[in-house]
Amino acid sequence: MENRALDPGTRDSYGATSHLPNKGALAKVKNNFKDLMSKLTEGQYVLCRWTDGLYYLGKIKRVSSSKQSCLVTFEDNSKYWVLWKDIQHAGVPGEEPKCNICLGKTSGPLNEILICGKCGLGYHQQCHIPIAGSADQPLLTPWFCRRCIFALAVRKGGALKKGAIARTLQAVKMVLSYQPEELEWDSPHRTNQQQCYCYCGGPGEWYLRMLQCYRCRQWFHEACTQCLNEPMMFGDRFYLFFCSVCNQGPEYIERLPLRWVDVVHLALYNLGVQSKKKYFDFEEILAFVNHHWELLQLGKLTSTPVTDRGPHLLNALNSYKSRFLCGKEIKKKKCIFRLRIRVPPNPPGKLLPDKGLLPNENSASSELRKRGKSKPGLLPHEFQQQKRRVYRRKRSKFLLEDAIPSSDFTSAWSTNHHLASIFDFTLDEIQSLKSASSGQTFFSDVDSTDAASTSGSASTSLSYDSRWTVGSRKRKLAAKAYMPLRAKRWAAELDGRCPSDSSAEGASVPERPDEGIDSHTFESISEDDSSLSHLKSSITNYFGAAGRLACGEKYQVLARRVTPEGKVQYLVEWEGTTPY
């Protein structure tokens, strides 16, 4: 992956004031928008900007003023409504030159009407964005307008990087043709109401081939960027990217490391986008990964032999039940898999730098601004050292948490919160557990792992007279439920005299009073002590079946019996798993 220098003057705003689009020009665009687009007529051939950043030839079938869009038929006979802002039409031959922005026909010093050498439309030098013919950007012959520069330079896999058109595109990308603060975004900052993205201002789909700038959070088409060495995969967001506006120069990009679970997730997502199927055979998944091995840019995983890739992928599919669904779970073939939720994988936020660590515009190092290809070592020394320390700390923490991940969310009620903290899943990527606790917070045993895929269920004997046994998982008491020291001493003295019933599986209550105490332990203790009364009720409700019921864990009653002493007991099958 090619890394361009991350400019020391990276800012929170979109460029300096002198580089912002001319607000007067933008106002003229809005005022004359309908008059300009009234030239679009049925049967006219136009270029339409699509969600991938590319332009496609089409023929207008219908014009809608209310929708400010046209129904366009493309070369493959497909029909779509396209917004006026995304339609590029040609000028009329022989027509008197006039500005396509302000519709004016007069020219002045340093404000002449320039005719685009491709579309034939005219633009005042001051109306064009950026201003045409400035001191640092002389006019080319022939001259091309902003839209035609994009139409000439954008490519699938990345825009042109060499030549006059590529240099002009880089200059054009330094200024946006819209006001980003006016865009109305959704809460995850993935879509906006205006359907305005990238440098080109066209439509886009964040879950396809788009990069999100880490600073301004705008999305940019793969086809409009000039920093990629390899084409992108659908939904691949494992990049640290800064746009040209934020970096005040060429784009900066860095590939983030992927784990095997991310590789197979990305492969399943791409297979689903391309074939519209839900389930895929493991051999099909493996073949896809091997075929796109170079495009995945896996870093340290790249050296993995072909023979070792299959076991790693299969282990990830079987281990991470929170992401993948096996056909065996729905009584189909066990060698087919699909995504539980059809969304691309999230890059781990712990590997991204803190925005506060990035240099600002007022720093002394802003004088060292780089405009061309540079190595990361050319950044200011102090910033580089600080960046390395933070990156190493975050990466080591991420790898440690990945080595001891949470238990499978299908068998543990605490997984939603734990998975979100480790893997940075968003809410639309985690299926909420129907049996989640409503008010209390519990912690699973440290031995549970996300790779645990046990299918057995725990069976426990539930006694009708409140003789609760300790649950299959160790749990910590809430702060208010910890035993007072005096109660622990009394419980230890009475422990040898207190009988305890065994469960249907033959598991007895532990002798340590911290882990479980039979309810009859307190019969000889005065109930006048309010703390002991509260302790008795809290422990009874926390440990064993009562605690599992309070957590909302699902269960099924398998049998009922009456003991010779007249006690009614039930054999209960719990949904969760047990290590014992």
Curated annotation (Swiss-Prot):
Keyword Metal-binding: yes
Tissue-by-tissue expression: Isoform 1 is expressed in thymus, heart, lung and kidney. Isoform 2 is predominantly expressed in placenta, skeletal muscle and kidney, whereas isoform 1 is predominantly expressed in liver and peripheral blood leukocytes. Overexpressed in many types of cancers, including colon, skin, lung, rectal, cervical, uterus, liver cancers, in cell lines derived from different stages of melanoma and in glioma cell lines.
Region (Histone H3K36me3 binding): 74-80
A single Gene Ontology CC term: nucleus
GO BP terms: negative regulation of gene expression, epigenetic; negative regulation of transcription by RNA polymerase II; stem cell differentiation; stem cell population maintenance
Location of the region described as Interaction with SUZ12 in the Swiss-Prot/TrEMBL record: 531-580
Annotated ranges, domain Tudor: 40-93
Site feature (Histone H3K36me3 binding) residues: 47, 55
Stretch list, region Important for PRC2 dimer stability: 531-544
Result of altering residue 50 to A: In muthPhf19; abolishes histone H3K36me3-binding and impaired activity of the PRC2 complex and subsequent H3K27me3 methylation
InterPro entries: KDM4-like_Tudor, Mtf2_C_dom, PHF19_PHD2, Tudor, Tudor_PHF19, Zinc_finger_PHD-type_CS, Znf_FYVE_PHD, Znf_PHD
Biased composition (Low complexity): 351-360
Keyword vocabulary terms for this entry: Chromatin regulator, Metal-binding, Nucleus, Phosphoprotein, Repeat, Repressor, Transcription, Transcription regulation, Zinc, Zinc-finger
Positions where Phosphoserine occurs in the chain: 13, 187, 365-366
Biased segments, Basic and acidic residues type: 511-521
Region (Disordered) residue spans: 347-390, 496-521
ZnF endpoints (PHD-type): 96-151, 195-249
Effect of residue 50 to C: Abolishes histone H3K36me3-binding and recruitment of the PRC2 complex and RIOX1
Family that this chain belongs to: Belongs to the Polycomblike family.
Misc. remarks from the entry: Down-regulated in spheroid melanoma cells that display an invasive phenotype, characterized by a higher motility, a poor proliferation rate and a gain of pluripotency gene expression. PHF19 favors the proliferation and reduces the transmigration capacity of melanoma cell lines, 2 properties of invasive cells, suggesting that down-regulation may participate in the switch from proliferative to invasive states in melanoma cells.
Domain notes: The Tudor domain recognizes and binds H3K36me3. May also bind H3K27me3, with a lower affinity.
Assembly and binders: Associates with the PRC2 complex, which consists of the core components EED, EZH1 or EZH2, SUZ12, and RBBP4, and various combinations of accessory subunits including AEBP2, JARID2, PHF19, MTF2 and EPOP. Forms a dimeric PRC2.1 (class 1, PRC-PCL) complex consisting of at least SUZ12, RBBP4, and PHF19 or MTF2; PHF19 and MTF2 stabilize the dimeric structure which enhances PRC2 interaction with chromatin. Interacts with SUZ12; competes with AEBP2 for SUZ12 binding. Interacts with EZH2 (via its Tudor domain). Isoform 1 interacts with SUZ12; isoform 2 does not interact with SUZ12.
Record's function text: Polycomb group (PcG) protein that specifically binds histone H3 trimethylated at 'Lys-36' (H3K36me3) and recruits the PRC2 complex, thus enhancing PRC2 H3K27me3 methylation activity. Probably involved in the transition from an active state to a repressed state in embryonic stem cells: acts by binding to H3K36me3, a mark for transcriptional activation, and recruiting H3K36me3 histone demethylases RIOX1 or KDM2B, leading to demethylation of H3K36 and recruitment of the PRC2 complex that mediates H3K27me3 methylation, followed by de novo silencing.
Protein name: PHD finger protein 19
Organism: Homo sapiens
